[in-house]
């Protein structure tokens, strides 16, 4: 068991890095970062440079069912904060707030290097990023079993099979180009070379636990496939159980480029007239071929448990051990297999659809739909925003989003240019400060860019259909 826990920790910690997108960013088109959400977008300035460590860091974390106050809340009798696990808390109140299926997510990304420049009516960009994502989806039955035991399922089978786990950490090297092909249409394409660093997924997870009506026997049925990569060497015993986990003595730079992949981003912006424009993009459409330090583990079988009788062990000098016999029975009933076969992992693509209404040169209103696919499920969000550019050096955005089953997401973004530097910070959840107890998710993005040629870019855009 300790070896299994150690292996999970290695997988888990290997996947936590830096973060992804804020909805508010999409229409802050004075920032070079807009090309990460739509490759047809062209930054305001003729040239930009991203420095390692300061160009952009982003964090997105949350879930789709529970608010902060569902987990931590005030106990008036104790005059203190308690969790739902406190002895005075009603665990049923917590369970009743769960959906049949519940999602938890963490997105992280960091810009390592980037550069872009305008060439006539086109715009080139090159970026190096580290991206990570973690998703866990669990059924309500699993939470009920964990918190109340199997007494809630007497004579029934608890559904544990809708559990899924997905975690990915990779490097991304992208080369993008955006160009106006008609007076009112701009298109963009970004090609990405990917290098997988660590990965873990419950590819198939079918499991159920049956409890007899009198509670004196259990029957566990499993059909599970786990796939992952991590810089460890795993050995198993004759029954397929993990026997040993070893880390390599040294890791070279070449080890970071042994899991290659490829992806593309495609986008377009259409300017209907001086007041309306529309945009669409598909990003992260691709895959990674994992073939280095690959680990595949399957668990299949059915195991029945009726308890352990230790009464016969009293005064018995024999060498029989009931717990050892139980372990032997488990090994005989459940088949485990370990392999190192290569596998393809497809990224979770995202689709952005946007519309914009321009009141004038300095003010516009935007609508954005984002559809995100991951681990066999779909996450949908919508954003309305008001975007203003009161002076040349400042741009502001105020947004309202419906996301993760919550309707109280108010966001804001600020970009300030002090040539040759541009500073920015944004979030979709400043409402967290107003209603912290009702918060289900939070994201923030901030950084600094080096930019040049911004005034010239304005003159060029007056002759091209760039969204402002």
Identify the residue ranges that each predicted region occupies.
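Bacterial Sec-dependent N-terminal signal peptides
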Residues: 1-23, 355
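Subset of outer-membrane beta-barrel
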Residues: 20-468
């Amino acid at each position: 068991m300790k070896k299994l826990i150690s292996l999970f920790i290695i997988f888990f910690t290997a996947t936590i890095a830096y973060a992804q997108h804020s909805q508010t960013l999409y229409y802050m088109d004075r920032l070079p970062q807009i090309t990460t959400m739509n490759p047809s977008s062209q930054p305001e300035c003729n040239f930009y440079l991203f420095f390692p460590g300061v160009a952009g860091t982003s964090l997105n974390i949350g879930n789709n069912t529970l608010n902060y106050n569902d987990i931590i809340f005030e106990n008036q009798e104790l005059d203190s904060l308690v969790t739902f696990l406190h002895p005075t808390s009603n665990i049923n109140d917590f369970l009743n707030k769960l959906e049949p299926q519940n999602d938890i997510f963490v997105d992280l990304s960091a810009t390592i290097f980037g550069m872009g420049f305008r060439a006539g009516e086109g715009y080139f960009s090159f970026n190096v990023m580290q991206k990570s994502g973690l998703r866990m989806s669990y059924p309500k039955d699993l939470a009920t079993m964990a918190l109340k035991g199997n007494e809630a399922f007497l004579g029934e089978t608890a559904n544990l099979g809708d559990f899924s786990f997905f975690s990915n950490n990779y490097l991304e090297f992208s080369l993008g180009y955006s160009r106006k092909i008609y007076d009112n249409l701009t298109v963009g394409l970004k090609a990405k070379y990917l290098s997988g660093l660590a990965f873990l997924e419950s590819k198939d997870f079918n499991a159920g636990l049956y409890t007899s009506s009198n509670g004196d026997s259990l029957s566990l049925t499993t059909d599970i496939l786990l796939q992952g990569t991590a810089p460890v060497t795993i050995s198993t015993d004759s029954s397929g159980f993990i026997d040993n986990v070893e880390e390599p003595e040294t890791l070279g730079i070449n080890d970071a480029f042994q899991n290659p992949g490829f992806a593309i981003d495609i986008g377009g912006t259409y300017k209907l007239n001086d007041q309306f424009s529309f945009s669409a993009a598909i990003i992260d459409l691709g895959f990674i071929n994992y073939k280095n330090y690959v680990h595949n583990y399957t668990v299949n079988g059915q195991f029945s448990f009726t308890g352990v009788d230790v009464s016969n062990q009293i005064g018995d000098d024999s060498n029989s051990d009931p717990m050892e016999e139980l372990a032997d029975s488990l090994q005989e009933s459940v088949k485990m297999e370990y392999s190192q076969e290569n596998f393809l992992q497809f990224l979770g693509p995202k689709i952005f659809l946007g519309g914009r209404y321009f009141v004038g040169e300095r003010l516009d209103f935007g609508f954005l739909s984002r559809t995100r696919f991951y681990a066999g499920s779909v996450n949908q969000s919508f954003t309305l925003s008001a975007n203003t550019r009161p002076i040349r050096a400042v741009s502001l955005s105020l947004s309202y989003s419906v996301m993760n089953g919550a309707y109280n997401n108010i966001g804001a973004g600020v970009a300030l240019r002090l040539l040759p530097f541009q500073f920015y910070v944004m979030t979709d959840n400043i409402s967290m400060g107003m209603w912290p107890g009702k918060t289900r998710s939070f994201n923030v993005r901030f950084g600094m860019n080096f930019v040049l040629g911004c005034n010239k870019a304005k003159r060029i855009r007056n002759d091209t259909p760039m969204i402002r």
